[in-house]
């Protein structure tokens, strides 16, 4: 029986001696690797924070003390220790544990996260609320060096330092993005700063010197000038000192006694304090240590080797990367921009082939969009590759800096629609709705990976802002054309003719419509199928033609219904006076979509062939009753 078997709650953790925590850390790593190998998830980030999380929960008293996890990629140990060990096997599964902190799941998840760089702002708000209420608790924000590149984090640091609020920020530095400290003197000064005697001794010495007649103030000034010169040897720490934080570190994030010591010291600091902790991403699992980027977020894998199952089909992301390289070979104006997602957006091949035309701006989506606008002004064709959910963070820049000026910026929106196991914070189900109202913007969504290639060709040749939205995962396995052509803007594609009802689908719902039409034909209902291709502008002529022809429409989209593609079709019919046409909208309801396998989520929310078939059959029965009603009246 291991130590972990006896851990059900934080009280069990605190009953252990500090010497037992390293053994517990090893057991936690084994559990995480075993579980994530089956469920998928964020492996390397969690392996890197095992000791850090143990130390935090050993010193701080959650839930009374607040611990906010930035992004949430690294919350697995936290979940195991806070009463959810028995559920950990359900991680990221439908109706199981979320892969991110979730306030609805546990009182220990004091703030929900999923997007980056929010923790310090939230923690500062909690700290201010504590002070306003006259309460006494610690508030801790845990943020990675990658997330610290987000502007919002610096905005929060700036105000926290200005206010002098008692707040602890733990910088989990696992990539050495912040410069290494320089030389022996820097290490010495760092050791001084981690000693609680340092601040007290400094104040006592200053007080003593000020009381010495004549020479005291001069000596004090001389010491201050030396200190000001030396302190800039501690490159990273001085940035935070200048912002008003007490800087403690750097600390070995896998040395539990050192972290227990520094966290206790941080509790004693009056005012904001930043604890700089150095960790190794993927720690304790050789494949993840060797390739932490690959194991940042993974699907199921063989824990013995780290190998993942292969799929002969290519993903939409891979098609994007290949196609953009192909297009850029022929057009030197094409540039690629990503916000810290080079691999995730498929831009690895582009970055290697065209390093001078590739820009990774870090976690700075707003900057990425306006950077693209500036490049477009000067005649380039920038392609901003970004997950749908993260474009939400740059909405004003899309409107104000790109679309208002009608600049030729391409938005390649990966992970559009239901993303799956990453859950509520990552589902890309709002983009149709928030982009459709924007003037000057064209928006497309492909039915398969081959059409996607042609849409990319269309996008880079368009003389204005344009977005193409595509799903996560593999495509249909269709053949890929070698020669690409630009599609006519706003032109739909008719895939099937029928007189009984029309199915108008967009994006990855088109194959669902085609399959449903085949089943309906077997049941005596002939359906027209239209691949809309464009959310904006709509093919008004095509839609109105089939509305008049069949009198019944079903729209299909993997987006919220409110303000989405189906709503656009309804608005068109009203504008054209076709108010007698019956329209049924199949899409997502007015809720945040939880985590789970995409096929289970689609089944729950009715984005299925069966739902389309049942809806069409119901419309046929209604039509039959309407035809019968006048006869009964006679």
UniProtKB/Swiss-Prot annotation:
**Cellular component, GO annotation:** cytosol
How does it associate, per the subunit comment? Homodimer.
Q: Which cofactor does it need?
A: Mg(2+); thiamine diphosphate
Q: Sum up the protein's function in the record's words.
A: Catalyzes the acyloin condensation reaction between C atoms 2 and 3 of pyruvate and glyceraldehyde 3-phosphate to yield 1-deoxy-D-xylulose-5-phosphate (DXP).
**What gene is behind this protein?**
dxs
Known EC number(s)? 2.2.1.7
Organism annotation = Desulforudis audaxviator (strain MP104C)
What's noted on cofactor binding?
Binds 1 Mg(2+) ion per subunit.
> For Mg(2+), which residues are the binding ones?
145, 174
> What SMART domains has UniProt attached to this entry?
Transket_pyr (SM00861)
* NCBIfam families listed in its UniProt record: dxs (TIGR00204), PRK05444.2-2 (NF003933)
Keyword annotations of the record: Isoprene biosynthesis, Magnesium, Metal-binding, Thiamine biosynthesis, Thiamine pyrophosphate, Transferase
Protein name, entry field: 1-deoxy-D-xylulose-5-phosphate synthase
Family, per entry: Belongs to the transketolase family. DXPS subfamily.
Top enzyme class of this protein? transferase
Molecular function (GO) terms for this protein are: 1-deoxy-D-xylulose-5-phosphate synthase activity; magnesium ion binding; thiamine pyrophosphate binding
Sequence positions that bind thiamine diphosphate: 73, 114-116, 146-147, 174, 285, 365
Q: What is this enzyme's catalytic activity, as reactions?
A: D-glyceraldehyde 3-phosphate + pyruvate + H(+) = 1-deoxy-D-xylulose 5-phosphate + CO2
- Report the pathway entry: Metabolic intermediate biosynthesis; 1-deoxy-D-xylulose 5-phosphate biosynthesis; 1-deoxy-D-xylulose 5-phosphate from D-glyceraldehyde 3-phosphate and pyruvate: step 1/1
Q: Name one Pfam family in it.
A: Transket_pyr
> Biological process (GO) annotations?
1-deoxy-D-xylulose 5-phosphate biosynthetic process; isopentenyl diphosphate biosynthetic process, methylerythritol 4-phosphate pathway; terpenoid biosynthetic process; thiamine biosynthetic process
């Amino acid at each position: 029986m291991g130590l972990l078997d006896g851990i059900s709650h934080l009280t069990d953790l605190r009953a252990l001696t500090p010497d037992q925590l390293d053994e517990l850390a090893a057991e936690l790593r084994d559990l995480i690797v075993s579980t994530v190998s089956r469920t998928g998830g964020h492996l390397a980030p969690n392996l890197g924070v095992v000791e850090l999380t143990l130390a935090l929960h050993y010193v701080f008293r959650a839930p009374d003390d607040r611990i906010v996890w930035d992004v949430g990629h690294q919350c697995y140990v936290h979940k195991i220790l806070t009463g959810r060990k028995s559920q950990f096997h359900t991680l990221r599964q439908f109706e199981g544990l979320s892969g991110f902190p979730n306030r609805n799941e546990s009182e220990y998840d004091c703030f929900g996260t999923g997007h980056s760089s929010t923790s310090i702002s939230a923690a500062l708000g909690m700290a201010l609320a504590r002070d306003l209420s006259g309460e006494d608790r610690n508030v801790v924000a845990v943020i990675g060096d990658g997330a610290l590149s987000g502007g919002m984090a610096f905005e929060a640091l700036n105000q926290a330092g200005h206010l002098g609020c008692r707040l602890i920020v733990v910088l989990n530095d696992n990539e050495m993005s912040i410069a290494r400290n320089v030389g022996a003197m820097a290490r010495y000064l760092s050791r001084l700063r981690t000693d609680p005697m340092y601040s007290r001794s400094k104040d006592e010495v200053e007080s003593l010197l000020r009381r010495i007649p004549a020479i005291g103030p001069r000596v004090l000034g001389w010491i201050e000038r030396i200190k000001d010169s030396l302190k800039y040897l501690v490159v990273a720490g001085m940035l935070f000192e200048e912002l008003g934080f007490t800087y403690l570190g750097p600390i070995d994030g896998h040395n539990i006694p050192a972290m227990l010591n520094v966290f206790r010291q941080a509790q004693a600091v009056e005012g904001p304090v930043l604890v700089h902790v150095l960790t190794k991403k993927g720690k304790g699992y050789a494949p993840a240590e060797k390739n932490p980027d690959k194991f940042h977020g993974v699907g199921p894998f063989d824990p013995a080797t780290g190998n993942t199952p292969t799929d002969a089909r290519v993903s939409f992301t891979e098609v994007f990367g290949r196609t953009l390289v192909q297009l850029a070979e022929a057009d030197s104006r094409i540039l690629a921009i990503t916000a810290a997602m080079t691999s995730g957006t498929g831009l690895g091949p582009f970055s290697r082939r065209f390093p001078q035309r590739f820009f990774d701006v870090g976690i700075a989506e707003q900057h990425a969009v306006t950077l693209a606008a500036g490049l477009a002004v000067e005649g380039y064709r920038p392609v901003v590759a970004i997950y749908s959910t993260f474009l939400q963070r740059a909405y004003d820049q899309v409107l104000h800096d790109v679309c208002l000026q009608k600049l030729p910026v391409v938005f390649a929106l990966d992970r559009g629609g239901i993303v799956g196991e990453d859950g509520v914070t990552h589902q890309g189900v709002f983009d149709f709705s928030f982009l459709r109202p924007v003037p000057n913007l064209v928006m497309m969504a492909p039915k398969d990976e081959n059409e996607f290639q042609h849409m990319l060709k269309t996008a880079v040749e368009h003389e204005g802002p344009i977005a193409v939205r595509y799903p996560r995962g593999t495509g249909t396995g269709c053949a890929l054309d070698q020669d690409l052509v630009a599609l006519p803007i706003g032109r739909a594609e008719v895939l099937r003719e029928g007189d009984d009802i029309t199915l108008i689908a967009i994006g990855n719902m088109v194959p669902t419509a085609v399959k449903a039409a085949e089943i309906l034909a077997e049941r005596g209902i002939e359906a027209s199928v239209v691949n809309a291709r464009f959310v904006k502008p709509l093919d008004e002529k095509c839609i109105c033609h089939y509305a008049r022809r069949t009198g019944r429409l079903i729209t299909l989209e993997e987006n919220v219904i409110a303000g989405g593609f189906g709503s656009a079709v309804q608005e068109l019919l009203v504008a054209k006076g076709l108010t007698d046409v019956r329209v049924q909208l199949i899409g997502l309801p007015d809720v945040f979509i939880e985590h789970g396998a995409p096929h289970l989520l689609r089944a729950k929310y009715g984005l299925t062939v069966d739902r389309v078939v049942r809806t069409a059959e119901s419309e046929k029965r209604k039509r039959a009753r309407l035809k019968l009603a006048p006869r009964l009246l006679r």
